[in-house]
Amino acid sequence: MDSRNFLIVGGSSGVGLEIVNELKSQRDEIYVGSRTSDKLAGLERVHHLKLDVKEPPEHLEGLPDVLHGFVYCPGTIRLKPFQRLTRDDFLEDLQVNFLGAVHVIQACLPNLKKSPTGASILLFSTVAVTTGMPFHASIAGAKGAVEGLTRSLAAELAPRIRVNAIAPSLTDTPLAAGLLSSEEKRQAAAERHPMKRIGSAQDIARLALFLLSDDAGWITGQVFHADGGMNALRTFK
């Protein structure tokens, strides 16, 4: 199989870094857009592009002419009572989770359209969009916009470009460190899920790898719940 080119925004930590490592094992060329690159040092076929999604450029310098896939990983976890959320809280969550994705997709869409075999866009939502949870108003609103964007773009860009999203529950990554800072918190979080464990970065990355692959060539406009059963199941003991 010929080498492919992927852009992973937010690929320097957490789920994004795990996706980078999975793609790297397939000998693909990977372009990582992020603010930091410490964890990317020495990785073969991994190219770093300095990028802050709060201030995205109109043009992304350093990308190859053709992209076969794009993944947007940046996210926020801002859990507050609704009355304590400020306008700036809502705006920042929208900027990082939704508008950042919009800007980067617009910048790299010409590269994706040049893929001779079609391309794939993968975004990230959250289980909190479809499962109402207290203190999630801001992030659920921002990720709800991501789900709407996923379906709208999938319709607009078909059949050449597929667009899907993954909606995880709590995953063991640096972003969630504050929610998993003690063994008691980890156990309580695990118990809330029907599968009785917290998600791992690898759980999410392997689903992402499938959705980026030709094996998922008939899948578009979908939101996949990788959430330990939280969205769909109620286990009564």
Regions found by a protein language model. Name each.
Residues 85, 132-140, 152, 237:
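Active-site loop-to-helix junction immediately N-terminal to the catalytic Tyr of the SDR YXXXK motif
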Residues 81-82, 86-94, 189:
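Substrate-binding pocket helix/loop in short-chain dehydrogenase/reductase
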Residues 158-162, 219-221:
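Short, small/polar-rich loop/turn modules that mediate ligand/substrate recognition or access, typified
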Residues 105, 142, 150:
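Active-site helix of classical SDR
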Residues 12, 20:
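N-terminal Rossmann NAD(P)H-binding glycine-rich loop of SDR-like oxidoreductase domains
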Residues 110, 154-159:
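Alpha-helical segment proximal to the catalytic Tyr-Lys
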Residues 220-237:
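Short C-terminal tail/terminal secondary-structure segment
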